[in-house]
Amino acid sequence: MSGDGLQAPYASPDPPGRDDWRTTFRPDIPSSARIYDYFLGGKDHFQADRDAADQIAAYLPNMREAARINRAFVRRAVRYLVSEAGIRQPIDIGAGLPTMGNVHEVATAAHPAAPGSYVALTHGTADAAPRARDAARVYDAATTRMFVRSRAEVLALARGLDAVEPGLVWTPEWHPEPGEQVPARPSDCYYYALAARKP
């Protein structure tokens, strides 16, 4: 059971013998942040992260592109929420490692007085890619549990919030930049995207 009260059917228990795995730096154990860095073409990852990323990509062949599109959504959402919706304090939960176009950089560019906080969500799903459950198990063996949720479960996470148009959509469909190519099958990006504000 996750903290939101929803069943997390694809998560496994903590890996055996890893009582200290969350507090000790272990480059031999994959990290979700470093895996994401690898998918984004970054430099801050180790062989264990690359191996785990390759396993994930075997299940989800578009994962590198999905990570890039997911990151682009974060930038678009922050830019919109700061410049259009008046949000002044964006918060990026599960941000991964620092990379170009961080939330605070985008927020400051959109509104120089913005201290840096917003509500935007991307969430992995198996709705269009059942093998995402297998990829989630690779993350489970690393330092972070991965939960893939259905559209209804992601909407339940945002209950009580006012969604920004277009609501919950695939990441490349949320306010694409002018000239930005939206894939023919947006669901191949494996993530839902939503921006919302607390009423």
Mark where each language-model region is.
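Rossmann-like AdoMet
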Residues: 1-112, 190
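Short alpha-helix
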Residues: 145-171
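Short Gly/Pro-enriched turn/cap motifs at secondary-structure boundaries
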Residues: 27, 145-146, 184-187
